[in-house]
Curated annotation (Swiss-Prot):
Taxonomic lineage from the root: Bacteria, Bacillati, Actinomycetota, Actinomycetes, Frankiales
GO molecular function: acetylglutamate kinase activity; ATP binding
Protein name: Acetylglutamate kinase
Pathway where this protein functions: Amino-acid biosynthesis; L-arginine biosynthesis; N(2)-acetyl-L-ornithine from L-glutamate: step 2/4
Entry EC number(s): 2.7.2.8
Record HAMAP family: ArgB
Gene label: argB
Keyword ATP-binding tagged: yes
Length: 362
């Protein structure tokens, strides 16, 4: 389809010239030609917008048909303006030819609902103690509230989102996980580690042009239902799908070089460099960086940790030359240039063993 074009102004022999009728061109209020400072400013603004589009072009070309898994959480999930921006980003990616999967938790929403029920929230070793009563609330909130909210937000911008959980079609299979406190195992209830991923359903949805939105609960090998970490779930799914990128939204700018002594953000680092830093990271960042490490070690070319407080953070990272946040790659200095061959296609459908356990729970 041809792009629409602007209708050119009528020719009058040039600025200030007169034709046989004595016309001096399009008059503006006050006798000017409409080419004053306001028009110039509009032209500069339009030019800036075209520069943004041109900068995005090689990245749009490179990632055409690529699969991207986004772990959605933090302020981007709770602040109305950021929620709208995220949903718009997802639909923009879909219209740009990318295959997008959203994985979410919902820790704050679960805690708030438990408080309303008078049920205290207890955490041991970063894991929510999940009794059968608590697990009922986790499922209800993640599937009945958070998942429906995310699906609705995305579908307000385009009818693509389909909600499901790790239980559906046995997408995730989990095994019970204890917490480790002072070197000892502590039972925390229905908390699990993902041990298998069946990506067939997600691949089918992606193949039909949909955007799967996945809640982080899993069916257990024992037939039970388990609360699983959303960062880890996103990483395992990215590996199983053969994704090009894993994107993790956080409430910080990225990985800091020497926190708290410095607020300098590391722009990119290799997986080896990340593994050297892991023991020194703060507790809140460890599960996110462990998820990135798992994804890259599992064959995902790139993992990103982004500040979800920045509107349209996902688009800024993927479609601009500088990006934002922290990029983790297989080897330092090997971030792909626009126009390089895309990552391998998704793995064939089937059961994909998951990696080692990481992260806390919602």
């Amino acid at each position: 389809m041809n792009a629409p074009t602007r209708t050119p102004p009528p020719s009058n022999g040039g600025h200030g010239s007169t034709g046989s009728t004595g016309s001096t061109g399009d008059a503006a209020p006050g006798g000017g030609t409409g080419r004053g400072p306001a028009a110039t400013a509009r032209g500069h603004a339009a030019l800036a917008k075209t520069q943004v589009l041109i900068e995005a072009l090689p990245w749009l070309s490179r990632f055409q048909g690529a699969t991207i898994v986004v772990k959605y959480g933090g302020n981007a999930m709770t602040e109305p303006a950021l929620r709208e921006a995220f949903a718009a980003d997802v639909v923009f990616l879909r219209h740009s030819g990318l295959r997008v999967v959203v994985v979410h938790g919902g820790g704050p929403q679960i805690t708030a609902h438990l408080e309303r029920l008078g049920v205290p929230s207890t955490f041991v070793g970063g894991l929510r103690v999940t009794t059968p009563q608590t697990m009922d609330v986790v499922r209800m909130v993640l599937l009945g509230q958070v998942n429906r909210d995310v699906v609705g937000l995305v579908n307000d911008h385009g009818p693509f989102a389909v909600g499901l959980s790790g239980e559906d079609a046995n997408l995730f299979t989990a095994r019970r996980r204890p917490a480790i406190v002072d070197g000892r195992e502590v039972d925390v209830g229905l908390v699990g580690d993902i041990v298998e991923v069946r990506p067939e359903t997600i691949n089918a949805l992606l193949g039909s042009g949909k955007v799967p939105v996945v809640a982080s609960v899993a069916r257990g090998v024992d037939g039970g239902v388990y609360n699983v970490n959303a960062d880890t779930a996103a990483a395992e799914l990215a590996v199983a799908l053969g994704a090009t990128k894993l994107v993790v939204l956080t409430d910080v700018e990225g990985l800091y070089a020497d926190w708290p002594a410095s607020d300098e953000v590391i722009s990119e680092l290799s997986i080896t460099e990340l593994e050297q830093l892991l023991p020194s990271l703060t507790a809140g960042m460890i599960p996110k960086m462990e998820a990135c490490r798992r994804a890259v070690r599992g064959g995902v070319p790139q993992a990103h940790v982004l500040d979800g407080r920045v509107p349209h953070a996902v688009l800024l990272e993927i479609f601009t030359d500088d990006g934002i946040g922290t990029l983790i790659m297989a080897e330092s200095g090997t971030s792909p240039e626009p126009g390089t061959p895309p990552a391998p296609a998704a793995r064939p459908a089937g059961i994909v063993p998951a990696g080692e356990p990481t992260g806390g729970t919602p």
